[in-house]
Amino acid sequence: MTTESMTTESITTELLSLPLDELLKRAAAVRDRRYGTRVTYSPKVFIPLTMLCQDKCGYCTFAQPPARLEAPYLTPEQVLDIARAGAAVGCHEALFTLGERPELRYRVAAQWLADHGYASTVEYLVAMCRLVRDEVGLLPHANAGALSRDELALLRPVSASQGMMLESLNADLDCHRGSPDKVPQRRLDTLEAAGELQIPFTTGILCGIGESRQDRVDALVAIAEAHRRWGHVQEVIVQNFLPKAGTAMHKSPPCPHDDYLEAIALARLILPEDIHLQVPPNLTDDFGELLNAGIDDWGGVSPVTADHVNPERPWPALERLTDVTEVAGHVLAPRLTIYPEFALDPERWLAEDMRFGVLDRSDAEGLGRDRDTATGDPSAEVWYSGADTEPPLVVEAPNVSATGALAELMRPATAAAGSAVRGAVAEVLDGVRMGQVPGEDEIVTLFGARGPEVRAVAALADELRREIVGDEVTWVSNRNINYTNVCTFKCRFCGFSKGPLSLNLRGNPYNLSLEEIAERVVEAKALGATEVCLQGGIHPKFDGDYYLAVTRIVHEAVPDMHIHGFTALEVTEGAKRNQEPLADYLRRMKEAGLKTLPGTAAEILDDEVRQVLCADKINTEEWLHAHRTAHEVGLRSNVTIMFGSIEHPRSWARHLLITRALQAETGGFTEFVPLPFVHMASPIYLQRASRRGPTFREVVLMHAIGRIVYRGAIDNVQASWVKLGLGGVRQLLRAGVNDLGGTLINENISRAAGAEHGQMATEADFRALVEPLGRRLVQRTTLYGRVDDAGHARIDTEASRNTGLNSALVAGA
């Protein structure tokens, strides 16, 4: 049964005739089909701008007369204090709730507004939304009631979303007598105008205030019809009436529980599926039961402010909300006041001045960023990629049985009692356990994992790691030599490249001489390095012969030094500037001493993303061609991905699959190296056009899902301690990672983007990281051979097999 073309009469006969159990079953099925296991909430602060109101609703304790208030309105300082308190503990939303048009009823309100230079309450609300957005960065949600089209338009540039409860379309309710703003047509006009203005809108119904079942259906049908016209209703709240002391309805019975469940289920079945369905968790004692009625959102939950509309009913603590949600087989995720469907289409749904604020607080799915603090204390310093802070605990030590059974790994000790991973994520993991390679949609599903689902993905990845490469953790002693930071390309993410017209983010442009490069190679050898990594900008004066000269000077300085250098961009440009085929050029580079290419310059192998990040750089096919050609001439390379800037999980999935396909063709990739975007000094972030890097949940998933997708293709997964810190890497070693990369003497590309971690790690640092986990640290060569105690590379046939190279390539190496 669908509701797209159902009339009110047919809805009444079809749905109201069903028993409650059947309604609940159908509603939950709709929710599961559309939203899976995910249930969202909005971390918010509640800002009661004014508690004066011209209406006299019989159930309301929010509205107060002037005599009971210290002042008619909160001052700007009070508004900022509330907003800052919320921002300090990770809130994303500033919910402005206020009485409707109090200046029309109370002279004191009109006088206060006039004294402060405002013509109306809405005008003052606009100013306070702008103040909070600009000074604190929270995203305003304006819940100002029945507004005119012009008033809604005034608020659109300073709010991420707006809202108004429709409540009921019954014009004869006693509770609304003396309340001019509750006239049904007035509220319908506001709902319609919000759609015309393309405002992400929240509305809802109030159950138990004297309305009939048919009244509820009529209101839900009206909301559904408005949404079908404009697509603007992002959520509908179904709220139950509870009597409150001091109100005209204090002796009225509360909304019967079964009536409330029925109303929620009806809403899910009547409304279009793309409208989210919300209930307030603080108004029902056993709120977990409401999940059975098809809801997918708990609404705003504040860690610092009361529910001023229902002050006698405090919000549940986040820990309890999480536990209740997970015990019911769902996972909890923070969101913004604007839902992902709207946040990911900012040109349509957001005024220009609101777009960066939403982007800055978004994760890759358009949901709210996790509060990434190490201790769980929401006021602690937040982790970002590159920041010198501990990440949150996402992957805890699994409850491993004596046999290491995956079934035990899938039930981590951190999960709430009685909870289990189910739904789409579990289905994909089941397929992986049966040997299937996940496809694009399935990989996107895994990247959407939350809570216990993340731990299940990590557990499976780590089991695969153990099967494929065992418990050794490898590292290579190497030195980075970045020979120039002058670059003709305009990659918008890069804080390393310099040019005469570019923003100078990290010192003056430089260009090392060949003699200086040779000296650094000799120094690296003296420090025990077995590899040098050569990378730099694309200098306008360099041609292909320059890269050949660098390779030769390095090889001559230390003949047994492994030369790992020159990205796909550098070799492509070198060949192009020399006007010779890439294969011929790479053969000459190999003859000069080059052994392997880094996978950098890949960024995201999705040309739609590359057009924004690096429009003048090589495209996806050119990157693949460079590495395919390198493999064909006997050079090896690795796969990197830079994630967390502007792209979304589908681009990640495409990147993984397209590189897996090339590996199946050539066998030339030795490892997968995820590189989290470091935002602090990146031009695109400073231009207010990117996110602030991945969340740590996304970091864990990238490494774990990489391990899963590349099973049987690329055996080694490396974590970048430079971008993540050793504390971040520690958790990744329980999520499929088996390699720490290099000691990276003189690593300065990440630092140019704002990373705070040091430029060198030591073997002792790595050992302190690995051994407490019961793993064994082993020094390797670039190609995953082993290094003996004297620092000499030795052939390790098992390690050679683990590189994933095909036999023909090994023979031609």
Residue ranges and their predicted role:
Residues V39-V45, A94-F96, P140-A142, Q162-M164, ...:
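Hydrophobic faces of well-ordered beta-strands that scaffold small-molecule active sites
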Residues C53, T61, L98-E100, L166-S168, ...:
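Short, small-residue-rich loop/turn micro-motifs
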Residues E14-L15, P43-P48, P140-A144, C207-G210, ...:
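Conserved short loop/turn motifs at secondary-structure junctions
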Residues V39, P43, C53, Y59-A67, ...:
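Mobile, glycine- and charge-enriched loop segments
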Residues I11-G58, F62-Y73, E77-Q78, I82, ...:
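N-terminal [4Fe-4S]-dependent radical SAM core
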Residues M1-K25, A29-G36, L80, A87, ...:
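Auxiliary Fe-S-binding modules of radical SAM enzymes
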Residues A27, C57, F96, M164, ...:
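Conserved, mostly hydrophobic/aromatic
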Residues Q64-R228, A415, A420, K498-R654, ...:
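Conserved Radical SAM active-site core
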